[in-house]
Amino acid sequence: MDKYVPPYDITEEMLELTSEITEDLGKLSNVNDLERLPRLRRVNRIKSIQSSLAIENNTLSLEQVTDVINGKRVLGPQDDILAVKNAFAVYKMLPELNPFSLEDLKKAHGVMMNGLVEGAGELRTGSVGVINEQGKVIHVAPPHDMVKGLMEQLFDWLKTSKTQMLIRSSIFHYEFEFIHSFMDGNGRTGRLWQTSLLASWKPIFEWIPIESIIKDNQEEYYRAIGLSTAEGKSNRFILFMLGVIKKAVSELARDTHNHQSHISNQIRALMSVIETYPMSAVELMEKLGLKSRVTFRKNYIQPALDAGLIAMTDPDTPTNRNQRYFKI
């Protein structure tokens, strides 16, 4: 019996976009300060979560999502707040998830939808359809008794296919949405899983907020899914996602450059001597050859704290005489 292969064509336009994205990623890999920009990474993670949930009609703003993640009290629908907490938890799991495992996909869905739906993490046992804003049914998913077999076939293909990951992950994203494996939460889980697949190829994708670009082009996203379904192959969706990924990579390159340009020579000097274990101001000043505590605090410590590059052992009492600083 022939192995299942999702229907799609590799076109010249796809290959051109793939080549351009790979080239852009090559330029981005030269910007090695991303690991030293925890604030940018955190901002991008929050953008990913807020955007993906907003597509599913979550009402919380970027500021509110940030507050929820930072443990602050937020006024809003309890389900929306829980959805943010769940999404943050599952995005933190990305490095541990195996994107080629159906069991890990189910585990991720279980965390994503915990407390929001019955049967979180379990393949659906009922019929589902996709309804647009006008209340029109735009997609009827395959019968529930076919879901397990379809997903196993899809993962078998995903694991063995030699198709370039930018294209392969987009095909998976479309096929997953078509099958609609779960009763709810398929959209946010599908977007998470494409990120997981891309990060298995290039780890930097863990911090590229592709979901934000999808949200900005939400109508085209659903149109690409609809056209692919009508045409019986995922070409339209692949092209849409490649365009989204290209834009997201370009925006990360811009944002990284902007963050780097705001790092002063003093901060760079501090980052070259500070360690990941706590160090006193006296130790750091000695390594930097500084005498003035005022200069040290104003030009070195405070800007590095503001940039999210270092942290204090006692942040509630900044002037504590036993205060220590460490690299994040």
Model-derived features: where do they sit?
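FIC/Doc superfamily catalytic core
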Residues: M1-I328
